[in-house]
Amino acid sequence: WDVQGYYGNPTSKLWLKSEGEAALGEGVEDAEVQALWSKAVAPYWDLQVGVRQDLAGETDTHAVVGIQGLAPYLFEIDAALFLSQRGDLTARIEAEVDQRITQKLILQPRVEVSLAAQDNPARKVGAGIDKIEAGLRLRYEIVPEFAPYIGIEQGWKLGDSARYTRLAGDDPSVTSVVIGVRFWF
């Protein structure tokens, strides 16, 4: 899942974000929730600060500083730095763009890159580029506020992260099918 919502005005907002992964027939593999205060710093760009709580595995708490906005050519960007209570520094950047096939059918390529400043074998994270995920989602906007989608995502663990994953008996390359609904009100 990947859920985002906010309350506020165009220049100052409280964002709540949550994302996680679970395989059919298995428990939750990875999950987090974030509470962020967001302040407009430029047209189409917000600076965000707040807290992130991991909900699966090691339940670390992180301070968050990030930026979210709309880059040229309508790329939606969400980039954040995370500092855990253990002193682990990580970062994540996500980018996506809507490509209209018809007025109602939209193809959305997306990419996410995760980085870590130091090794954390307990979380299967190596220093450097930890993980890259790339995917395509095809959605049909029944109305602009409601659009079911289906997609495919490919994720790769890299470097020491891939080594830690293999040592745990898991595959560092994972292909996933995603199904969901995008809605707003």
Predicted features, each with a name:
Residues 1, 29-33, 59-63, 87-91, ...:
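Residues that define the transmembrane beta-barrel architecture of outer-membrane proteins
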Residues 1-26, 35-39:
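Outer-membrane beta-barrel initiation region
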Residues 3, 35, 65, 93-95, ...:
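Membrane-embedded beta-strands of outer-membrane beta-barrel proteins
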Residues 7-9, 39, 53, 69, ...:
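Residue-level signature of outer-membrane beta-barrel architecture
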Residues 10-16, 43-47, 73-77, 102-107, ...:
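Repeated loop/turn-to-beta-strand initiation elements of outer-membrane beta-barrel proteins
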Residues 16-20, 49-53, 79-83, 109-115, ...:
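Transmembrane beta-barrel strands of outer-membrane/channel proteins
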Residues 60-120:
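Detector for outer-membrane/organellar transmembrane beta-barrel domains
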Residues 135-141, 171-185:
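Outer-membrane beta-barrel "beta-signal"
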